[in-house]
């Protein structure tokens, strides 16, 4: 069990890291010659924390967007209202139900996951349209666990400009969100990608984020769980890379000589 001193040190480190992230976001936006940032708001803890960082980095030039599809966010709007009250972030709602239904019908995709992944990809396209309209960068909400596991949609929620919390484990996200006074209901909500009704991350993965946190911080966990986590990481390596390219023609020519 950690002592009070250790807990205080960890919280102080997280608070300092949060301050660093705010300055990092400012720097990256400045380097890109942009005016601010935009973030998709789901009602979950990851987007709530990124919303806090966005507002702190750009009090006048930050925007949150909710993008419900069907009933995917019907239970989240009360939490989003609390987040808006806390952060004072401007949050607008863009209902993508009709757009999704039309695209899904046109594509006529039968595979359940392929069809579900249209949702985050449609949201990505919407975020970038709004970001370009405002001359903003898009902030992603993937944490370290999700990034390591590849637990995101390629060119969906993984298609962003900046990933501010991608080096924070789930438990660290929770702790920093608590420091920023994010509502308890958001913090305690079961993690879900929202790809279909009643979907829960940990049920789909087959292990908990707590176990992933321990694995990522080099702590002891069940060897079978560790093997599953590492296998998931290896299988999703392509998600963390830009499109794979062949050998350069000059290198090819030199190799053939």
From Swiss-Prot:
Record family assignment: Belongs to the NAD synthetase family.
UniProt binding sites for Mg(2+): 46, 146
EC number: 6.3.1.5
Complexes and interactors: Homodimer.
Binding site for deamido-NAD(+): 121, 154, 161, 238-239
Its biological purpose: Catalyzes the ATP-dependent amidation of deamido-NAD to form NAD. Uses ammonia as a nitrogen source.
Gene Ontology BP, a term: NAD biosynthetic process
Pathway(s) this gene product operates in, as recorded in its UniProt entry: Cofactor biosynthesis; NAD(+) biosynthesis; NAD(+) from deamido-NAD(+) (ammonia route): step 1/1
Protein name, per record: NH(3)-dependent NAD(+) synthetase
An example Gene Ontology molecular-function term: glutaminase activity
Catalytic class of the enzyme: ligase
Gene3D superfamilies linked: HUPs
PANTHER family assigned to the protein according to its UniProt record, in alphabetical order: GLUTAMINE-DEPENDENT NAD(+) SYNTHETASE, NH 3 /GLUTAMINE-DEPENDENT NAD + SYNTHETASE
Domain of life: Bacteria
Protein source organism: Mycoplasmopsis pulmonis (strain UAB CTIP)
Residues annotated as signal peptide: none
Binding site for ATP: 40-47, 141, 170, 192
Sorted UniProt keywords: ATP-binding, Ligase, Magnesium, Metal-binding, NAD, Nucleotide-binding
Single GO cellular component term: cytoplasm
Catalytic activity, reaction form: deamido-NAD(+) + NH4(+) + ATP = AMP + diphosphate + NAD(+) + H(+)
